[in-house]
From Swiss-Prot:
Catalyzes the one-electron reduction of superoxide anion radical to hydrogen peroxide at a nonheme ferrous iron center. Plays a fundamental role in case of oxidative stress via its superoxide detoxification activity. Pfam families: Desulfoferrod_N, Desulfoferrodox. PANTHER family: SUPEROXIDE REDUCTASE-RELATED. Its cofactor is Fe(3+); Cu(2+). It is an enzyme of class 1 (oxidoreductase). It catalyses: reduced [rubredoxin] + superoxide + 2 H(+) = oxidized [rubredoxin] + H2O2. Belongs to the desulfoferrodoxin family. Fe cation 1 binds at C10, C13, C29, C30. Its EC number is 1.15.1.2. This is Desulfoferrodoxin.
């Protein structure tokens, strides 16, 4: 059963969905169950995928990776998300954009997540 904020992807057509309200059932696309995109927190590519969270005067700045992630036509960050106090904030990106987002919110604890079109879903907490 899917849980709130989980990300699923169709292995056939590439559709991606985020669960906003967890119901009772499986997510199906193109006649097959969708694949849960587990959140990576570290691996050999950590310097390019794990979000870096910085507290700012106005809220939080999230940069993808301690080394700038490529933002090319074939390899880019599709979105950056910040979850704070049960609320999800997103910035959608496109090739050529900077792999970063600023969120003007007040919260003590946040989770940053991002999605790379080639390497999947990544997260960090602060």
């Amino acid at each position: 059963m899917p849980n709130q904020y989980e990300i699923y992807k169709c292995i056939h057509c590439g559709n991606i969905v985020e669960v906003l309200h967890a119901g009772g059932g499986d997510l199906v696309c193109c006649g097959e169950p969708m694949k849960l995109m587990k959140e990576g927190t570290s691996d050999g590519a950590k310097e390019k995928h794990v979000p870096v969270i910085e507290k700012t005067a106005n809220g939080y700045k999230v940069t993808v990776g301690s080394v700038a992630h490529p933002m090319e036509e074939k390899h880019w960050i599709e979105w950056i998300e910040l979850v704070a106090d049960g609320v999800s904030y997103k910035k959608f990106l496109k090739p050529g954009d900077a792999p970063e987002a600023e969120f003007c919110i007040k919260a003590d604890k946040v989770v940053a997540r991002e999605y790379c079109n080639l390497h999947g879903h990544w997260k960090a907490e602060a």
